[in-house]
Amino acid sequence: MSADTDRTAPPVEILLVEDNLGDARLTREALKEGKVYNNLHWVKDGVEALDFLHKRGKYKDSPKPDIILLDLNLPKKDGREVLQEIKSDSRLMRIPVVVLTTSKAEEDVLKTYTLHANCYVTKPVDLEQFIKVVQSIDNFWLTVVTLPNGK
């Protein structure tokens, strides 16, 4: 995190749902440089994501995330299914979900917005651009936007 990060405020809880270890590491590094103190929780598939959100198993003490970064192409349970479950659950539906995926397919964009994703971002393949995209998400969603207090 940067030196100007406000550590007196409670950290923003971020759930990253990403099966690619490299992308997860890059996301973590980019968020460390962000302006907002945050806790990044990383799960590798859709089943784990729902366990985290519903506080099941090893996630029984997990915090409710303030924002979710969701990949679409996940093992075990697809990101679209995860998004549908989040947005149909009254306890979870107000959590902003940022779809962060490699897919540029128009049907994926349309489907995720139909399922009430809050935004759709295509991951750049270029390393520096990827970091800039994550930092832009951080800046917009954690600095500019006022999120509902879900605590």
What feature does the model see in each segment?
Residues 1-16, 20-41, 47-50, 54, ...:
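Non-catalytic signal-transmission and effector/linker regions of two-component phosphorelay proteins
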Residues 20-23, 75, 91, 103-107:
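Negatively charged, flexible loop motifs adjacent to catalytic sites
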Residues 57-63, 87-94, 115:
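Conserved phosphotransfer cores of two-component systems
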